[in-house]
Amino acid sequence: MCIRDSTHTHRDHAAGYPGMMKRFPDLEVWGHEEARVPSLLGNVVFRKVDFTHTWDNEPGECVDWSAGSVNLVMTHSPGHAPGHVTIHGHGVYHAGDLLFVRSAGRVDLPGGDPRAQQRSLVRAKEILSGLPVDWRLIPGHRYDNFRGEVPDWISLGDVLQHNYFLAHITMPGED
């Protein structure tokens, strides 16, 4: 059995799915129900992915997922894209395009929602703050310079300290 989890279906993350499905016909492809192509305009930005299995959890809600000895937690983290999820377990937090090393994903593409992104960032900060600081955050892109490099990953301790969005994110009504 081969399994592929999708954080979201923007073309830069999902372009290879048809070829993967052809090459590995038994591939299980997991994604959030809301990540299905949202509109005609969205077809330019999103790639249709025929998920074999979906989650339908509410924004910010975590779902435990297991396959063999692999146990992960999927959190519905919309904002950058509908149905965006983050995945964590086994010492890794895969942020997709919710978070990068020092910044966060954009919300100006079709399906982007700044308010949902803000809520997802607040929830991500809560989750990251409860995980070991030596775990690794893997961003969906390597955009940010950190300590003279553009790293593939950053420790959760460093991302909590140096990510501008996490350092300053609040929801209206919070102190």
Region locations from a protein language model:
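Metallo-beta-lactamase
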Residues: 76, 81-172
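Residue-level signal for the nucleotide or nucleotide-sugar donor/cofactor binding architecture
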Residues: 15, 72, 111-112
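Beta-strand-loop-alpha-helix segment that lines the small-molecule cofactor/substrate pocket
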Residues: 1-2, 95
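Active-site HxH/HxHxD metal-binding segment of metal-dependent hydrolases
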Residues: 4-68, 162
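Beta-strand-turn-beta hairpins that frame and shape the catalytic cleft
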Residues: 63-73, 88-91
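Active-site-adjacent C-terminal substructures of enzyme catalytic domains
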Residues: 41, 74-76
